[in-house]
Amino acid sequence: MEASLSLFRPVATCCRRVALSSSSSSSQKAAAVAGISVRYQSTANRTKRMLNIPPHESFLNVPVEGDRIIFNPPSSEASVYHTPFKFLPRSDPRRRANIYKLFKPPQAPITTPESSSTDAAAADQHGDLPPVLYNPTKSYNVTPEQVEEIRELRAKDPKKYSVTYLSNKYNCTKVFIMMCTQAPREHQEQHKLARARTAENWGPRRAAAKLDARRRKEMLHRGEI
């Protein structure tokens, strides 16, 4: 009896081991199935893979053997007048047409009946050249008596009779008014104080910009720039 039991003991041990291994493998499979993550379309890799679209042929570089001038025309029929001036040969008549178009005035200037005859004669003489530019005639319409009056008004009330007011009244430039007279010293001091109060409200960036502009102006007057 004991001999028979000793014979069956290794078989029982093997069966027990097989049962244990099968149970452990089944539990591992169940755990693995329970822990599997489902991947949807919102996964980063899949989205990146879908967006990885090859570029269009128009974005690709042209091979060296196929170098050419690229011209993207609009949605209309191409015209010969679109050829750049640099790419036209010297014997091409379009160069002369382009030069004429460059020097042609954009619109006809306003002319008076007196100047129309002279302009017509000049046009016949010079051909299709641009119109002649004339310097404006200087008008000396302020008399010495008016200059004295300007000085009196400026000294009387510099706030009311400002440079702009006097230039409009006597039909002259602001530079001429400032050449004729200057504001009283008290008015100049008040103007400086007002500018100083305005500068106090500036931020650091604007103050630095004003300082740089003042330095550049001084360097320009000294001929350094």
Swiss-Prot record:
Statement: the UniProt record of this protein carries the keyword Ribonucleoprotein: yes
GO MF entry, a single one: structural constituent of ribosome
Annotated Gene Ontology cellular component terms: mitochondrial large ribosomal subunit
Keywords on record: Mitochondrion, Ribonucleoprotein, Ribosomal protein
Pfam family, any one: MRP-L20
Transmembrane segments: none
Biased composition (Polar residues): 109-119
Domain of life: Eukaryota
Location(s) in or outside the cell: Mitochondrion
InterPro entries documented for this protein: Ribosomal_mL58
Region (Disordered): 106-138
Subunit structure: Component of the mitochondrial large ribosomal subunit (mt-LSU). Mature N.crassa 74S mitochondrial ribosomes consist of a small (37S) and a large (54S) subunit. The 37S small subunit contains a 16S ribosomal RNA (16S mt-rRNA) and 32 different proteins. The 54S large subunit contains a 23S rRNA (23S mt-rRNA) and 42 different proteins.
Similarity comment: family membership: Belongs to the mitochondrion-specific ribosomal protein mL58 family.
Role noted for this protein: Component of the mitochondrial ribosome (mitoribosome), a dedicated translation machinery responsible for the synthesis of mitochondrial genome-encoded proteins, including at least some of the essential transmembrane subunits of the mitochondrial respiratory chain. The mitoribosomes are attached to the mitochondrial inner membrane and translation products are cotranslationally integrated into the membrane.
Protein name per the record: Large ribosomal subunit protein mL58
Protein species of origin: Neurospora crassa (strain ATCC 24698 / 74-OR23-1A / CBS 708.71 / DSM 1257 / FGSC 987)
